[in-house]
Amino acid sequence: MIDKNLTKENYRYNHYYLSYSRFSKFLECEAAAFSDYQTEASIAFLVGSYVDAYFSGEAEQFEQDHPEMFNSRTGELKKDFSRANDIIHRIAQDSTLMHFMSGEKQVIMSGEICGVPFKIKMDSYLKDEAIVDLKIMKDFGKVWSDAYRAYINFVEAYDYDIELAIFQEIVRQNTGKTLPCYLVCATKETPPDIGLFEIPQEKLDKALEAVKNNLPRYLQIRQGKVAPHRCEKCAYCRATKKARLISYEYAGMSGDELREEGIECNDEKVKPEEYSDNK
């Protein structure tokens, strides 16, 4: 369904719906996802957001909202954001990428997965043709994964397959059509590399199953039935950790590794949330 109460202006703050970004945080660290802890947006995040804003026609507003992009003395773009312009120009030069970026921008839809309300916002929605997401990254090389304890493809390392699986399912609920999903990508290298990548349907199906398998625990935590696990690696866990005496052999271990050793590291149970209270 398309909820008329869900708009571009309130999308970020409407917590009635679960978004991919919040679900992704939940997969990274349950405790952080259910906390009020806020971290400052990194330069890398802002650069990606600036490129997104350009292709959605919102670059001018983005610049007004983020004066830190500019050198306070000269008024010129700082180096990182000047590089973002190089990325924008590189994408704009490629007719194939621009076709996939020619869809309706920032389309919002909502639906349910396993009884949990979800919201999505698509970078480029080619009606009846494709779902397209724009990603900016360091390079296309493999990325270290703590979960797999190995270097893996960037798509799976950053959960882009999960993101597009959620998008595809919500679009299917709204339109009755299962659309192919693509990533328009560019790197921060000089000069930028570019790529157009399709996520195979079997990967999307597997990713959607992973979402469904994790939602029961998400609901249990949200309803205050179980305590969220700490990852003991992220900024939230470092900022809120309470010292306790353990063997030096456990130093630097993740929350999952500590739990495997029988050492509990959980936050307090959250206060139960009723969806209707946040709508």
Name every feature range the model reports, one short phrase each.
Residues 1-121, 232-235, 251:
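Metal-dependent nuclease catalytic cores that hydrolyze phosphodiester bonds in DNA/RNA
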Residues 38-40, 72-76, 145-158, 200-202:
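Short histidine-centered catalytic/ligand-binding loop motif
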Residues 55-59, 136-139, 172-175, 219:
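Hydrophobic/aromatic-lined pockets within catalytic cores
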Residues 65, 141-145, 178-185:
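Short acidic alpha-helical/loop segments enriched in Asp/Glu that coordinate divalent cations
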Residues 97-101, 126-133, 171-179:
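Secondary-structure boundary elements
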Residues 115-119, 126-129, 178, 189-192:
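Coil-to-beta-strand transition motifs
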Residues 120-150:
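Conserved catalytic cores of phosphodiester-cleaving nucleases, focusing on short active-site segments
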Residues 154-161, 166-279:
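Metal-dependent nuclease catalytic regions and adjoining charged, substrate-binding loops involved
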